[in-house]
Amino acid sequence: MKQFLDFLPLVVFFAFYKLYDIYAATSALIVATAIVLIYSWVRYRKIEKMALITFVLVAVFGGLTLFFHNDEFIKWKVTVIYALFAGALLISQWVMKKPLIQRMLGKELALPQQVWSKLNLAWALFFIACGLANIYIAFWLPQNIWVNFKVFGLTALTLIFTLLSGVYIYRHLPQEDKS
């Protein structure tokens, strides 16, 4: 259910873009993200930091898009989110004692420190690459291609990278955890 909720605003954005335009899609994205946030609070009595940050960025960049009637703001939102994710991962890698990935998954998985560090760095580089790809596609290709890339391309890339991360983790699990 939670994964469905995470993707709901993206599906709403895509549907409104196909039915109307980027501005209707942006409005729908803001509303859908707010509804998901409210639902999460009512249902789980908890709002994850990432969801709150995403909502704030959607509201700010979406609001600027609507206020100035300029789609460049909503296009930048994707890169800003990826830059924040990459930055958080890199700061945790080089400044804090534990990589962020380890903080998120370390209770469920026993992995060597080197594996956590490599996984954390790999995700940071992945987010940087996605942010750069978004800049190129958003500002040098037609809007409809960017929307398709945002909805399908980035989602597919994230799924593939998640699967590859799972394979990498599995290879480094202690034997007793693999069963």
Curated annotation (Swiss-Prot):
The keyword Glycosyltransferase does not apply. The keyword Transmembrane applies. One of its GO terms (cellular component) is plasma membrane. The chain crosses the membrane at residues 22-42, 50-70, 76-96, 121-141, 149-169. Its main location: membrane. It is a multi-pass membrane protein. Keywords: Cell inner membrane, Cell membrane, Membrane, Transmembrane, Transmembrane helix. It is found in: Cell inner membrane. Plays a role in cell envelope biogenesis, maintenance of cell envelope integrity and membrane homeostasis. NCBIfam families: ispZ, PRK00259.1-2, PRK00259.1-3, PRK00259.1-4. Belongs to the YciB family. HAMAP family: YciB. This is Inner membrane-spanning protein YciB. It comes from Salmonella typhimurium (strain LT2 / SGSC1412 / ATCC 700720). The gene is yciB.
